[in-house]
Amino acid sequence: MNQDQLKKMVGDAARDEVLKLPAGQILGVGTGSTANCFIDALAPHKDHFAGTVSSSNATTERLLKHGFKVLDPNDVVSLPAYVDGADEIDPQGHMIKGGGGALTREKIIASMAQQFICICDSSKQVPVLGNFALPVEIIPLAKGVVTRELEKLGGKVTLRLAKSTRADLNQTPSEPFVTDNGGWILDIAGLQIADPLKIESQINQIAGVITVGLFAKEKANILLVSNAAGVDRIVL
């Protein structure tokens, strides 16, 4: 079974999970290829929900294409659930997220939700976070000072570069990747994150950091994880 099949399988399982919610709720929706599978699976049932709150411009575009109502987060007080993928997840439900660059908005929407439903395949499960590079969104003018502070953690820090042209942000390959918020991303490789809550707090206190892609405070409550045998539901 390939990665695309595993993503579709867990997307279908997430659809079934959120359809247990009472009708008329507002749903938080994440960003990335696995979240896209969830959106596509949920599309025939869009009328079950009063609306959605999106974590990125790309997700908003996909939701609108399917006919979902997308609401401004400032107009929503709370959400019953937020559904999103992860780049890594440990046994406690702490995650590394932000491989797609939407970490700040993802964390904002996750903080509004009563439960975080993480969807991924079993390759994302790790005993200790850090094999996947940890993203940190920053204000561009703070690149130097933040890099120096992050290097004290012991990993290798690199500036994320754009992979493709993005005209709306004047972004071309080999130039810094620009987030939906206009920030840059520093990726830290080679960390072993034994205390995610501590590292999350430490990095977030560095001047110039918008947020770090550690989801320790806003950890997953339910994990839907796909493998060759099916989808496991784990309460964290």
UniProtKB/Swiss-Prot annotation:
Query: What positions does the entry give for substrate binding?
Result: T31, G32, S33, T34, D84, G85, A86, D87, K97, G98, G99, G100, K124
Which InterPro entries does this entry report, sorted A to Z? NagB/RpiA_transferase-like, Ribose5P_isomerase_typA_subgr, Ribose5P_isomerase_type_A
Q: Does the keyword Isomerase apply?
A: yes
Annotated Gene Ontology cellular components are: cytosol
The active site consists of E106 (proton acceptor)
**What is an annotated GO biological process for this record, any one?**
pentose-phosphate shunt, non-oxidative branch
Name its pathway. Answer: Carbohydrate degradation; pentose phosphate pathway; D-ribose 5-phosphate from D-ribulose 5-phosphate (non-oxidative stage): step 1/1
Q: Which UniProt keywords apply?
A: Isomerase
Q: What is its EC number?
A: 5.3.1.6
Q: Which GO terms describe its molecular function?
A: ribose-5-phosphate isomerase activity
**So what does this thing catalyse?**
aldehydo-D-ribose 5-phosphate = D-ribulose 5-phosphate
Subunit note: Homodimer.
NCBIfam families named among the record's database cross-references: PRK00702.1 (NF001924), rpiA (TIGR00021)
* Role according to the record: Catalyzes the reversible conversion of ribose-5-phosphate to ribulose 5-phosphate.
Q: Which family does it belong to?
A: Belongs to the ribose 5-phosphate isomerase family.
HAMAP family in the record, alphabetically?
Answer: Rib_5P_isom_A (MF_00170)
Report what the protein is called.
Answer: Ribose-5-phosphate isomerase A
**Organism for this UniProt entry:** Polynucleobacter asymbioticus (strain DSM 18221 / CIP 109841 / QLW-P1DMWA-1)
